[in-house]
Amino acid sequence: GEGYLTKRQGRGTFVTATKIIRKVHQKDDVQSFTQACAENGMKAGARVVARKTVAADRDLASFFGLDEGSDLILVSRVRTADGVPVLFENNYYPVDGFEFLKDIGLSNCSIFEAVGERTGRYPCSSDPCRLEIARAGIDAARELKVPVGEPLFFMNAGFLDSNGERFCYGRQYYVGSRYSFDI
């Protein structure tokens, strides 16, 4: 495989080696952050950072079966456990059927529950789902209260409902020292 170029300020441009991908089968169930906190005896919190319409990039368009550049609703939130920032959540939804996301209260609640209460649809599986390590950029570092460059878990996940229909797509940043995955 081919690498890609990475610019490092003050150091130059380097070729980054292609990553090896190992498939680990994930169970066909989706646990929300709110549920994970409850199971660990912690109180989940959420603060909305942004809520806006964005143009679908190639990957998002492919997942939703839309044309590249089609409108999607992006909801970005910081999720906390007992008041400590753990997750910078970026969920993308198709506009059709999810217009209410522009107006409803999404602080200190499960977005999956909020959507389910209005649509009867809940995420039941994720495909694709990829977990890798990424360094915190300026936005993620600010929201998660970690240094720029801090290693974070980065999850790309497409969520499907019980009928196998596309539900939402998440691009999530987790603080590794504050979160663990049971795969």
Regions found by a protein language model. Give the residues of each.
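C-terminal regulatory/effector modules of DNA-binding transcriptional regulators
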Residues: 65-68, 81-84, 95-97, 102-183
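Short loop/turn microsegments at loop-to-beta-strand junctions
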Residues: 73-75, 154-155
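HTH-adjacent hinge/linker in prokaryotic transcriptional regulators
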Residues: 1-68, 98-124, 180-182
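Short glycine- and Lys/Arg-enriched binding-loop motifs that mark or flank ligand-binding interfaces
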Residues: 6-8, 79, 160
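A short glycine-rich, His/Asp/Glu-containing loop-to-beta-strand
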Residues: 46, 75, 85-91, 174
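Residue-level recognition of beta-strand microenvironments
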Residues: 51-53, 78, 158
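Short, surface-exposed charged micro-motifs
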Residues: 4, 90, 171
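Short, charged beta->alpha transition segments
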Residues: 34-35, 79-81
